[in-house]
Amino acid sequence: MELDKVKTHSLHCNAAVLSSLQAPTSATSPQSFTSKANAVAEAAFIENSNQQQNVQKDLNSHNRDCDSPVSSTSELEKEFDDLRKLHTSSLTNSVVVGKSTGSLNGDYSITSATSKTKTLESVVTINSATGSACLTIASTADHIKKRIPNSRTPTRKALRIKFYRNGDRFYPGVTIPVSNERYRSFERLFEDLTRLLEENVKIPGAVRTIYNMCGKKITSLDELEDGQSYVCSCNNENFKKVEYNPGSQPLSNLTLTNNSRPYNQRLAKHRPASPLKNGLLVGSSPLAVCGGGTGNGSPLIASKSSDRVTVVHPRIVTLIRSGTKPRRIMRLLLNKRNSPSFDHVLTAITQVVRLDTGYVRKVFTLSGISVVQLSDFFESDDVFFAYGTERINTAEDFKLEPEELKAINVIRKTMRTAGTTCKGPKPKMPIKSKKVYPPSVNSEAFKAATAPEDDRHATLLTSTGIEINELPSNIRSTYTLGKIIGDGNFAIVFKIKHRQTGDSYALKIIDKNKCKGKEHYIDAEVRVMKKLNHPHIISLILSVDQNTNMYLVLEYVSGGDLFDAITQVTRFAESQSRIMIRHLGAAMTYLHSMGIVHRDIKPENLLVKLDEHGNVLELKLADFGLACEVNDLLYAVCGTPTYVAPEILLEVGYGLKIDVWAAGIILYILLCGFPPFVAPDNQQEPLFDAIISGIYEFPDPYWSDIGDGVRDLIANMLQSDPDVRFTSEDILDHYWTIGNEGNECTTYKR
């Protein structure tokens, strides 16, 4: 606090005043001397009065600078009156006591303005004709301090709280001040946390719940404790008990000073962002999180971490666990989510290999070269030895036993990218699982075309067993009915046109009588589609539920489904396939971020928009009849045989990654015109055995002109083990999908 120079208020009196203070019973001075002293005091009083306005201006200026209330001029006058009465009570002659901004002889005093100062020094100067004497009166001024409250002191100290993202053990968290003044309601805190998390990580929705680190639900601001950490949950997610960012700085070391916000923002930006959020491309931060040290001095430095974005891509590596031979062989999927830094990769490896000695401290390639930086995991080597604190025998430990070599070769066989010669006839596409009705040209259709509109509608509906009067009135009055564009086991689809705008839509009529016992699938389809809003997912315009039928007005795509397009062109170029897999991957990423699995991804359920030359411009995912929300492992056996994942057939429980398997089958078909797993005469048992084995080929001549990049992507999407299979985000992160195929020469050799 700066020091303010406060001019002293001098009290001038004659020598008689001084003598009266020292000896109240002393004799009275001569009259002439008294008159002279009174004249001097009167002159001082006049000068002080003239400068009173300047004193008030100085006080007002000081009040504005300190931003705190000060005593008014009237209050100061009262104090001077008290002083005057105190001293004049002992005077026998008339004495004038004046208040001044400075003594006549130029004396002044300095008063500290700090909050700890509890005394105010007042200097009283008494002048006489022969000399002067100073009387200093010191009095405590606690009452003045009470009249000058510190407006900067908050009424309640804000709590220092750290929040994590539920289930995300790599997110460093965000620390914010929390108080009742800052957040008037719990919902306001939810809104602020949603905004902060969306800036740094991808979340499936708004923050709805807060848990403490033990999983107890927090229901009010009063339950939050200062210095503690909490977990934010979105869309009513259950609490996930994981080790939340063990390498982050302890909360006790964080401060809420003016530098705390830039620190938290910088730390939060270290975590890599997904390249696709709700179908829109977003940038990734070039920085990586420097996690907790491994104990052996991990060589991750700032200059290397800046290259993380360029080196990290989805990749499956093989791990050999240290121990007694033959050693255990495991696999691990590395991607931007679990590999933002070298230390994070070591943590991921530790959780997979589970060493007896604890944490993985050292990693070596198959040739015995030490892995010392993040980029080493994403180069040509894909097999690594994992060690803890035990000593390493370089002469023996890096030699593979026959059993170990066999296990590695089996793994590599499922990742095969080399072409083999196809023996026998070319495999064929499976039969389409639904019927498509082409336009009829017979005489009956011609008569129907020339009939009135209602008659044509009746003709179309009668062929499907639906009466025109059964159509909901709002659909019948708003749209005109067109041709049948497809049907399935439980539904039929018409092309309809809006009467006013002329825009085309699709009307899906679901027959409830054919869905006895499966009505929940219909309800789930409508419930899921109402939640969706993505450029590569068919939009639901209107739904009408009646006793016998469910009517869905859907977005219309002019090019038809992908199955028909494959039938016409047999195979697509890599550039066209890349467009379609990007759009499909974006749609799956959006679905999976909301915890929704489609369960029936196949060419028949993918609609395409074509240009005048037949090139695919856009792909949209449709038909959510089997879609559902995933809260735990699913066990229901469903889907289409050609595209079903092995975990569904094995009935061991499945989740979101069955959609990735189906997308891998589709990408394979796009490039060569037939699926990787086939059986003679489409027999299901041999087909299922082939799918469970996970072994397939890239046979020549159908794959001879197709690059290794897309083969690598397919191999990672068709992993039998869902734990190492690519996620939908990994599909989008793969260099072939991005279009950066220059990487493949050095980093994707098998």
Swiss-Prot record:
SUPFAM superfamilies: Doublecortin (DC) (SSF89837), Protein kinase-like (PK-like) (SSF56112). It catalyses: L-seryl-[protein] + ATP = O-phospho-L-seryl-[protein] + ADP + H(+); L-threonyl-[protein] + ATP = O-phospho-L-threonyl-[protein] + ADP + H(+). The active site is at residue 600. ATP binds at residues 485-493, 508. Residues 159-245, 315-398 form the Doublecortin domain. GO terms for molecular function: ATP binding; protein serine kinase activity; protein serine/threonine kinase activity. Residues 479-737 form the Protein kinase domain. Keywords: ATP-binding, Kinase, Nucleotide-binding, Phosphoprotein, Repeat, Serine/threonine-protein kinase, Transferase. Its EC number is 2.7.11.1. GO terms for biological process: intracellular signal transduction. PANTHER family: SERINE/THREONINE-PROTEIN KINASE. Belongs to the protein kinase superfamily. CAMK Ser/Thr protein kinase family. CaMK subfamily. This is Serine/threonine-protein kinase GE16371. It comes from Drosophila yakuba.
